[in-house]
A protein has these predicted regions:
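Rossmann-fold dinucleotide-binding core
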Residues: 1-102, 110-138, 172-198
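Short acidic alpha-helix initiation/capping motifs at coil-to-helix transition points
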Residues: 78-81, 143-150
Length: 202
């Protein structure tokens, strides 16, 4: 196809609904010859940094754009697992309420931990059902996956790259999906979470 003047551009896109409205992060790869043709359009529609730089640049040949997007998603798997473990520690270890945990996450979002995931997690903890019970306590405790975290972990294994955080996050999702097995195991090995002696403010 290249000999015929037809060039391939494989582009990872990230941003969800907010990205669709206000501009996504764009990760183009493929035929270098095509970059100058698509650059003006891609960088015009991409999200911008605080200093106006577009969140879009050429990342490499062939499938590099989608590879970067895959790794980006893998990193998010790790981030979400850390959020889950922080929530469980606060709830079961420190005995904090959903409102208290919301306050912590909202404060974190004003620091170097500021991120989209921290922001929406804080909002989730604040959301109440019609009966006033925090919605987070009613959500089914299972998690699915689309495969990008698994692909990232497999690539890390294939290349001998230590990536334990993301790999463990993938396994945590596998475990979360096994709801019947977890319920059965709990009946045999029921253990009450131990409280932690600690300062909630810390």
């Amino acid at each position: 196809m290249r000999e015929q003047g037809i060039h391939f551009v494989g582009t990872g896109v990230s941003g969800g609904e907010e990205g669709a409205r206000f501009g996504p992060s764009i990760m183009p790869g493929g035929s270098p010859e095509a970059w100058e043709s698509v650059r003006p359009v891609f960088q015009a529609i991409a999200a911008k940094t605080d200093d106006g730089e577009p969140c879009c640049d050429w990342v490499g040949n062939d499938g590099a754009g989608h590879f970067v997007k895959m790794v980006h998603n893998g990193i998010e798997y790790g981030d979400m697992q850390l959020i889950c473990e922080a929530y469980q520690f606060m709830k079961d270890g420190l005995g904090m309420s959903a409102d208290e945990i919301h306050t912590v996450f909202a404060a974190w979002n004003k620091t170097e931990l500021d991120s989209y995931l921290i922001e929406i997690t804080a909002d989730i903890f604040a959301y109440k059902d019609d009966d006033g019970v925090p919605m987070v306590e009613k959500i089914l405790d299972t998690a699915g996956q689309k495969g990008t975290g698994k692909w990232t972990a497999i690539n890390a294994l294939d290349h001998g790259i230590p990536l334990t955080l993301i790999s463990d996050a993938v396994f945590a999702r596998c475990l979360a999906a096994l709801k019947p097995e977890r319920v059965a195991a709990e009946s045999h090995f029921a253990i009450t979470p131990q409280k932690v002696n600690g300062d909630k403010q810390e």
